């Protein structure tokens, strides 16, 4: 309920309560007393509504804060895992594919050491912004910790994931070049045509592919369709 609706309801309640009090009295009250009593009841109801509305807003803010990375303003790991569980269950019901991707900034520590933490933070913000811009509103982008990001892509099959990985790499390269940063990225993505047994299995698979891309020499991507075709490597 909105604050405006709550105030209207509280006014109606105050008038109803006041009318009930007046009807219950054997003798009528003087007009100033009537006005004062009505004003007091209205004030009490309005104050209660405003207080409850403020508490509700604060609770919603705290809940959102607990699910958001404070630097990049994308979801944090906790929110990402919760969303992955929801989408995995939906994929089981609908039979639609689900894709998850992990992205790691190669040698991010060097950026922090050479340019400072402020530039490192700015780089992470730029990465998060690029990932949001390359994905749909129904998809989820999260900072999983440090310089590692995750993407949860609903109803996304193999060909669509292939295209997304290409778009991500191009967008990230452009964002880094614009700021003059020398940074590459390792990406691991997996599309589950058949839903995995658990969220942990889904996350672990993407993480393993990401590290496989790093072992291939970094600045690349590994993509796999579970049960479909062998892992692909994009240098």
What is the meaning of each model-derived region?
Residues 162-166, 192-235:
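Catalytic-core segments of nucleotide cyclases and related cyclic-nucleotide turnover enzymes
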Residues 1-33:
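Hydrophobic transmembrane alpha-helices
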Residues 140-143:
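A short pre-motif secondary-structure segment
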Residues 123, 150-168, 202:
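Short helix/loop segment flanking the catalytic signature motif in cyclic-nucleotide metabolism enzymes
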Residues 128-129, 160-178, 205-207:
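Alpha-helical scaffold within the catalytic cores of cyclic-nucleotide enzymes
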Residues 63-82, 103-117, 125:
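Conserved nucleotide-binding and Mg2+-coordinating catalytic segments in signaling enzymes
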Residues 63-64, 77-97, 128-136, 154:
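Short regulatory alpha-helical coupling segments
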Residues 42-66:
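Juxtamembrane or sensor-core-proximal signal-transducing alpha helices
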């Amino acid at each position: 309920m909105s604050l405006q609706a709550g105030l209207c309801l509280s006014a109606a309640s105050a008038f109803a309560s006041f009318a009930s009090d007046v009807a219950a009295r054997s003798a009528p009250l003087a007009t100033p007393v009537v006005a004062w009593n009505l004003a007091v009841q209205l004030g009490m109801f309005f104050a209660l509504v405003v207080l409850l509305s403020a508490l509700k807003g604060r609770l919603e803010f705290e809940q959102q804060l607990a699910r958001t990375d404070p630097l990049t303003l994308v979801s944090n790991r906790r929110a990402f895992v919760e969303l992955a569980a929801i989408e995995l269950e939906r994929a089981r019901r609908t039979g639609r594919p689900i894709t998850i991707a992990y992205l790691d900034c190669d040698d991010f520590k060097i950026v922090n050491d050479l340019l400072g933490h402020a530039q490192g933070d700015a780089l992470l913000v730029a990465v998060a912004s690029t990932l949001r811009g390359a994905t749909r509103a129904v998809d989820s982008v999260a900072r999983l910790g440090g310089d590692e990001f995750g993407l949860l892509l609903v109803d996304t099959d193999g060909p669509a994931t292939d295209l997304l990985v290409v778009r991500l790499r191009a967008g990230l390269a452009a964002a880094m070049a614009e700021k003059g940063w020398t940074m590459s990225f390792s990406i691991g993505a997996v599309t589950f045509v058949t839903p995995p047994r658990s969220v942990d299995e889904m996350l672990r698979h993407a993480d393993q592919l990401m590290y496989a891309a790093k072992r291939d020499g970094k600045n690349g991507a590994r993509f796999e369709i579970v049960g479909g075709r062998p892992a692909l490597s994009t240098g």
